[in-house]
Structure formats: C-alpha cells, structure tokens
C-alpha cells in the first residue's frame, strides 16, 4: 500500500494537541503540514520543533506561520493548494489522535478510485480524506464561511445530490 501523500492540519492555539496528533501517526506520510492560524507568534516556537522532531513514518514536515487567522476553510484550501498534484489530501483537526491502524485503513479506502471522500466516523469532517477529482468537480472550500463552522456542510451540499460514493465510517477509531 502506498503512503499518504499529504496529512494536514490547522491550528490557532493549544499546540500540545498537534504533538499528540503527530506521534499517533503510525503509517507512512509523505508530507505532514501544519498551518499556524495564530498570527500572534504565541505558538511558533513549539510548532517549529515539529520540523526537527524524529518520526519514523513522516518523510517531510512543513510548518507555515500565517500573519493572521485565515479561518478553517482558508487553511484547508492551503493544504490542498500547497500540494495540488496529490491524488488526495487527509485533513485533520489538530486535536485528533489516531488509534493504531486508523491511517492505514484511511489510505486503503482513499485508494479506491470511485470513493470521493473518506470520513473517519459517521460522515464527520474532523478527519477526512478528499480526492483530487472532488476538488476538480466541486471546487475548494468556501472561505466566506469565516472563521469556521459550516464550511464542511457547505461542501457536502455541493455533491449530496450527485450521489458521490463516500466511506462514512472506518472500522478503526480515533480520539477527538
């Protein structure tokens, strides 16, 4: 099975949760990216340490400090746009922790060509994989929904009547 091309998250505060997320990764990831939406320099140092922290499953760590909070959808779009050639993007809340095997299962589901979105649990958007063809067909997340909330439901409304195949829940769990 191939590695996850991109696993990204956005954060405004509480960087200790990102570290928990980081060390719960137990499956190969090519690019782990963090968009720091804090904009005040309060958590820059703690996040920069991720770039030098050893991790056997992560090939590249990218931390980008934004000058202001661009919002949830803005950060999600940056994850996608920063790795435009990826076949899919795993986007996760920063305070999620994966159980062993969760990312392997997500990668297996995302490898199915017909699947458009893989949700972690019950169709939720706290951790999901979005395929490249979904972005080509339905666009990016609406940044007018600022700073957060409803960007996920707005995106889902775009394809709900097209009967896009989705994986709504994985067998393996995660904590959030």
Residue ranges and their predicted role:
Residues 26-64:
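Acidic donor-binding segment of Leloir-type glycosyltransferases
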Residues 86-97:
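Short beta-strand-to-loop acidic/aromatic patch adjacent to the donor-nucleotide binding site
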Residues 13-27:
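Short, well-formed alpha-helical segments that are part of the catalytic scaffolds
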Residues 139-161, 165-175:
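Donor nucleotide-sugar recognition loop
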Residues 22, 77, 86, 100-111, ...:
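Short alpha-helix within the catalytic core of nucleotide-sugar-dependent glycosyltransferases
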Residues 96-127:
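Conserved donor NDP-sugar-binding/catalytic core segment of glycosyltransferases
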Residues 66-83:
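Glycine-rich, basic loop-to-helix element that forms the pyrophosphate-binding segment
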Residues 125-139:
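Conserved nucleotide-sugar donor-binding
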């Amino acid at each position: 099975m191939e590695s996850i091309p991109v696993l990204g998250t956005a954060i405004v505060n509480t960087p200790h949760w990102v570290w928990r997320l980081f060390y719960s990764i137990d499956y190969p990831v090519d690019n782990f990216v963090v968009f720091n939406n804090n904009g005040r320099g309060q958590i820059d140092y703690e996040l920069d340490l991720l770039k030098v922290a050893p991790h056997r499953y992560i090939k590249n760590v990218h931390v980008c400090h934004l000058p202001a909070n661009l919002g949830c959808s803005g950060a999600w779009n940056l994850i996608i746009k920063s790795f435009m050639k990826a076949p899919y993007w795993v986007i996760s809340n920063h305070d999620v922790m994966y159980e062993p095997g969760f990312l392997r299962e997500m990668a297996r589901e995302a490898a199915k060509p017909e699947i458009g979105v893989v949700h972690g649990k019950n169709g939720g958007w706290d951790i999901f994989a979005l395929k490249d063809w979904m972005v080509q067909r339905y666009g990016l997340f609406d940044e007018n929904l600022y700073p957060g909330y409803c960007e996920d439901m707005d995106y889902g409304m775009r394809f709900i009547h097209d009967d896009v195949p989705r994986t709504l829940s994985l067998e393996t769990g995660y904590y959030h």
